[in-house]
């Protein structure tokens, strides 16, 4: 708080969580009663509050409150009008059938509906252990609890299936945001870049985690930016190919076998957690908290560390890496793509109009006029594939990606500008937190 110059008492008010609470409930399953415990934490500096719901056997109240604070600052940083919240249910979803999970999810949602942050004041989404299926169940329960509020009840949940009011591009949004974050930082001449390079072409990239975020980030960076993803690490080991991994083939192998190990297109190293220590230009920890810590930070051989997971670099590791000249893009910024597209989904649900519906054909006709005029002026016909791409009016996913890129680029500019104005901040993480907290303080 020393860089902020806030009025007396305001820092304490910002730190406080408005509504941390515990829910306990029972569900009759398998001929007996099972008891469950969950938590929800709400920070109401701005409404509605946005917070994803995770199902994890190691969840606890302290983690939920910390993640709610992180969501508050993340929304503030990217200028999304949400307060922060978080929810968790202490459960291993793999131990229950889909039918049992539905009963549990609906009861959990009913308990949350009894609380003061119900319905239009909240916006939940998916996280670890939850997905489109669970979000559809939750939305249905919110609607049952608020039968007269059919206009806004669908907007209380994001990450829904497209058929239930979801939005194109939500599944890829965090990984896509990682790509835009890297592009934005490299494009900025105030950053060191990658040995002077301002793009990812040929850049060796190591990614820890091959779930939703890691997969999409790897795919987009390799297919669209020509990066070489040389190492992919998971819990049971890592795979490596100095020429670059085939991401789609590796994903299909993981789906078939349940592991990335044994992939034909790479060398597999089982049981070794040193994948993140392999030499590379870009290191993307996209799996777990505290993946880079004081004991292994000295062995990192990356020029740029991109925090796609929440809290993957500890405080001590951060200091070690920066003392060695490593640039770190902070999680508060890098993984904000998910909440940005969740905001787009909520807007879509509130307006009940898909993005692009009102202008797609008008834009298509305008592009057709331009293409025809150019062909007449030059006397040459455009190649069919180029013409078709140019004439495309813009599907919903194109508009979602465009909006996300704009948010990530403008947010990076805010962070870099603040670093330039206040060099004493020292690093991009501190600059991001200062920019975010100032915005919260102004609300």
Swiss-Prot record:
Active-site residues from the entry: 86
Gene3D superfamilies: Leucine Dehydrogenase, chain A, domain 1, NAD(P)-binding Rossmann-like Domain
Classification via InterPro entries: Aminoacid_DH-like_N_sf, Glu/Leu/Phe/Val/Trp_DH, Glu/Leu/Phe/Val/Trp_DH_C, Glu/Leu/Phe/Val/Trp_DH_dimer, Glu_DH, NAD(P)-bd_dom_sf, NAD_bind_Glu_DH
Molecular-function annotations in GO: glutamate dehydrogenase (NAD+) activity; glutamate dehydrogenase (NADP+) activity
Signal peptide positions (record): none
Superkingdom as given in the UniProt entry: Bacteria
Record bears the keyword Nucleotide-binding: no
Entry EC no(s): 1.4.1.3
CDD domains in the cross-refs: NAD_bind_1_Glu_DH
SUPFAM superfamilies: Aminoacid dehydrogenase-like, N-terminal domain (SSF53223), NAD(P)-binding Rossmann-fold domains (SSF51735)
Keywords tagged on the record: NADP, Oxidoreductase, Plasmid
One example of a Gene Ontology biological process annotation: glutamate catabolic process
Keyword NADP: yes
Catalytic activity as recorded in UniProt: L-glutamate + NAD(+) + H2O = 2-oxoglutarate + NH4(+) + NADH + H(+); L-glutamate + NADP(+) + H2O = 2-oxoglutarate + NH4(+) + NADPH + H(+)
Similarity comment: Belongs to the Glu/Leu/Phe/Val dehydrogenases family.
UniProt name for this protein: Probable glutamate dehydrogenase
UniProt source species: Sinorhizobium fredii (strain NBRC 101917 / NGR234)
């Amino acid at each position: 708080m020393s860089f902020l110059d806030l009025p007396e008492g305001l820092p304490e008010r910002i730190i406080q969580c408005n509504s941390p609470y515990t829910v306990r409930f029972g569900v009759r399953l398998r001929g007996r009663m099972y008891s469950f415990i969950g938590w929800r934490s709400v920070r109401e500096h701005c409404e509605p509050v946005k917070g994803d719901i995770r199902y994890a056997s190691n969840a606890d109240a302290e983690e939920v409150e910390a993640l709610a604070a992180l969501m508050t600052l993340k929304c503030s940083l990217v200028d999304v009008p949400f307060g922060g919240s978080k929810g968790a249910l202490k459960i291993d979803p793999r131990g229950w059938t889909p039918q049992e999970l539905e009963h549990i999810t609906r009861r959990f949602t009913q308990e949350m509906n009894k609380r003061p942050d119900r319905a239009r004041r909240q916006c939940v989404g998916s996280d670890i252990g939850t997905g489109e299926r669970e979000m559809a169940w939750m939305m249905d329960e919110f609607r049952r609890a608020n039968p007269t509020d059919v206009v806004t009840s669908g907007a209380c949940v994001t990450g829904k299936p497209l058929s239930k009011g979801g939005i194109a591009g939500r599944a890829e949004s965090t990984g896509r945001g990682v790509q835009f974050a890297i592009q934005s930082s490299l494009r900025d001449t105030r950053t060191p870049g990658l040995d002077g390079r301002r793009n990812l072409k040929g850049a060796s990239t190591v990614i820890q985690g091959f779930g939703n975020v890691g997969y999409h980030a790897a795919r987009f960076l390799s297919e669209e930016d020509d990066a070489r993803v040389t190492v992919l690490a998971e819990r049971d080991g890592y795979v490596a190919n100095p020429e670059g991994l085939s991401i789609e083939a590796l994903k299909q192998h993981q789906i078939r076998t349940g592991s990335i190990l044994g992939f034909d297109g790479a060398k597999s190293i089982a049981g070794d957690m040193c994948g993140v220590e392999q030499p590379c230009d870009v290191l993307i920890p996209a799996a777990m908290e505290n993946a880079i810590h004081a004991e292994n930070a000295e062995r990192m051989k990356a020029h740029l560390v991109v925090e796609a997971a929440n809290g993957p670099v500890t405080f001590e590791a951060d200091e070690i890496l920066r003392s060695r000249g490593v640039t770190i893009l902070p999680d508060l910024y890098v993984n904000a793509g998910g909440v940005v597209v969740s905001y787009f989904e909520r807007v879509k649900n509130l307006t009940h109009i898909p993005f692009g519906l009102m202008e797609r054909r008008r834009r298509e006709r305008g592009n057709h006029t331009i293409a025809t005029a150019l062909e007449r002026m030059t006397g040459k016909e455009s190649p069919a594939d180029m013409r078709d791409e140019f004439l495309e009016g813009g599907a919903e996913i194109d508009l979602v990606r465009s909006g996300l890129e704009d948010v990530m680029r403008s947010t990076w500019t805010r962070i870099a500008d603040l670093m330039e104005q206040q060099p004493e901040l020292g690093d991009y993480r501190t600059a991001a937190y200062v920019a975010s907290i100032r915005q919260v303080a102004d609300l």
